[in-house]
Amino acid sequence: MDAFGIGSSLNQAPVTQDLKKFGDNSTGNTMFDASQYAFFGNDVVEEVELGGLEEEDEILSFTGIAEDFSFDKEEVGDSRLLSDVDDLASTFSKLNREPDVYSNTGPITDRRSSQNSLAAEWTHGEELPNWYGRQILDSDAIKDDKVWSAQPFSSLDRVEQRIPDRTKLYPEPQRQLHQDHNQQQFSSEPILVPKSSFVSYPPPGSISPDQRLGHPNIPYQSGGPQMGSPNFSPFPNLQPQLPSMHHGSPQHTGNRPQFRPALPLNNLPPAQWMNRQNMHPGDSSGIMNNAMLQQPPHQNGLMPPQMQGSQNRLPHPMQPPLGHMPGMQPQLFNSHLSRSSSSGNYDGMLGFGDLREVRPGSGHGNRQNVRFPQQGFDAGVQRRYPFRSKYMSAGEIENILRMQLVATHSNDPYVDDYYHQACLAKKSAGAKLKHHFCPNHLRDLQQRARSNNEPHAFLQVEALGRVPFSSIRRPRPLLEVDPPNSAKFGNAEHKPTDKPLDQEPMLAARVYIEDGLCLLLEVDDIDRFLEFNQLQDGGHQLKQRRQALLQSLAVSLQLGDPLAKNGQSQSLDDFLFLRVISLPKGRKLLIRYLQLIFPGSDLMRIVCMAIFRHLRSLFGVLSSDPDIIKTTNKLATVINLCIQNMELGPVSTCLAAVSCSSEQAPLRPLGSPVGDGASTVLKSILDRASELIRANNFNNAGIALWRASFNEFFNMLMRYCISKYDSIMQSLQLPPHFATEISEEAAKAIVREMPIELLRSSFPHIDEQQKRILMEFLKRSMLGSQKTEPVLS
């Protein structure tokens, strides 16, 4: 304790005599001179140094300092009335005598010998940075500071009058509050500063409500003297991080700091100071949070130092600035304030509940209109979003955030979790679920008018997995590559394309496929909505809308109807349809389209006629890709299901489409290694017609159409069979004429190449003339062969 210069004078201080002298002096108009007491350094003025302001090699331990400042109960009880006055009086005197040493300690910039001018001098520091931010301190607050701090205090009458008030307001059992808090205390009244070099510490009971101002303190750890103001920091490198306070302002602090015992500033861990790096005059959030999280709630003002070290890590609320608020009753803010009430009051008065809403000129209004919420600061922080803004209020930011959440988080599993919900619905088909797999509402399909000269179309993402436009609509620039130079590779016939990528035919087909899949998703939504919702009109409007969507897809495919009544059927080349089905994803689109069309409708007939016109394009070549093979087989299965629900008229038109097509259908036997999809669907047509004819489920017009369609198909089938037989005989180097006995190898080739299943399915529909033609062909080609007789049985 010798470094502080108080090792011997502390225990020898005549506290009782000092109180008597102070009482005698307080009645007169003379200035209070604390230097007359040895307790204040009368004998050791020159030798005393203010602890912590000079760099020392030795760091004082917590135990040593605590032992020197362990007062007796009698000493504390006698000196707590005097400690308010003599605390910073000696500090200011020391600073006035040695201004060069403490030139970096804050707003004290000039040296003055008059002690009465100190308080007024501290009130003219408007050029200093504002601790709480410039938006809180306005011109009105500065004006109030000047008026308040400029009041004359020429005697000790005012001080003497305030001492009993403190005793009344804060009796002995309640004196431990602010000693427990371990935070800086500032007063708004000027102090008569005697020449003294010793720093005393006020007892907890002598702190008035006017001193309990809401300036946040710097977090600390126990073990040394804690200085209450950042302006008196012994660390020069910490000054840029800790902006000086505006002394004399009732908004922030008073005119004098109070120093605390056994609370070191020089022993502060660097990690706590690093938390202050983001502090600037306009940012008070870090000050607020660290001040509240670092203050220990002591329950006894005379807590032993050993207990203080463990308690300093506990959070503690800030105390509101009450000394400057008119009409406030100090009794409301006694030592029994709870954490929630004190922190809530601080939150309400200084506006820390929402720093975003602070505007210039609002600091004075916050002092006049004070609210006292019942909930604490922690609850206030939880209710707010952790963001601050400079130009927008909290309500504006929260409204924008709410709109974003509505757009991206609809809380509808059908939209946000579409694929997962679809898998669950597929696995639990037929089960009674609490939440059905259906949309909550149906959206209108937007009109996507696209121009040919549009460089980049709009990509709209509806939800997870629901992309109306594919990224292929806006291809990546890396796809725009020039072909290799023909001269470099010696290929004179290879010429670079002149068309840009967005004008390539296959790109247009891919874009159409994506648009078509999106349209079919809309149809799915309508079906699920109709399934799980009861509508007043029975869903008539939605059914019409559904049919219109499906018809629009057929129109966009440019599918012509040969049986159109208006006679204005479109061309049957089906160019766009062929482009779409040439891609595997296009075949998936066709599969889904057929599954959604109502069976037996005209739209089903139109689409199936287009399919039967292009059986070779769909089933002519068998791909080596297993996925493509699977898709092709699934397409054949779906077509068979559609045929099973047709009437005789649509069946007749589909069979006529095969005969009228410019493409030769691949008439292969079932199980052919090169694909039997076309034969499968043709056999389904013949079997469905036989079933309808046996059931007499037809009319005269229907049976006539069927006879005409079958006659054309049978003629085509016989021509194909004869042509295939000739090719087999030529491959085996046999005479082209019908032989009486064919070899075993020729019989196997006929079975392997002839569409035997189609011939067998045609028997119920042939007439007598067609039967004679067929039997003549069989007798001449397979006469006497026992191996081929079971084929036609």
Swiss-Prot record:
Highest taxon, organism lineage: Eukaryota
Induction: Accumulates in response to flg22 (at protein levels).
Ranges for region Disordered: 203-256, 292-312, 476-501
Sites of Phosphoserine modification: 200, 208, 342-343
Keywords of this entry: Cytoplasm, mRNA processing, Phosphoprotein, Plant defense
Gene Ontology BP terms: deadenylation-dependent decapping of nuclear-transcribed mRNA; innate immune response; mRNA processing
UniProt PTM comment: Phosphorylated at Ser-208 by MPK4 upon flg22 elicitation. Phosphorylated at Ser-200, Ser-342 and Ser-343 upon flg22 elicitation.
Any one cellular-component term (Gene Ontology): Lsm1-7-Pat1 complex
Primary site of residence: cytoplasm
Annotated compartments: Cytoplasm, P-body
Gene inactivation effect: Serrated leaf and reduced plant size. Constitutive expression of the defense-related gene PR1 and enhanced resistance to the bacterial pathogen Pseudomonas syringae pv tomato strain DC3000.
InterPro entries in the cross-refs: Pat1-like
Biased amino acid composition, Polar residues: 219-242
Role: Activator of mRNA decapping. Involved in mRNA decay via decapping. Involved in disease resistance in response to biotrophic and necrotrophic pathogens. Is part of a signaling pathway including MPK4 and the disease resistance protein SUMM2.
PANTHER family documented for this protein: PROTEIN ASSOCIATED WITH TOPO II RELATED-1, ISOFORM A, TOPOISOMERASE II-ASSOCIATED PROTEIN PAT1
Subunit structure: Interacts with MPK4 and SUMM2.
Name of the protein described by the UniProt record: Protein PAT1 homolog
Origin species: Arabidopsis thaliana
Gene that specifies this protein: PAT1
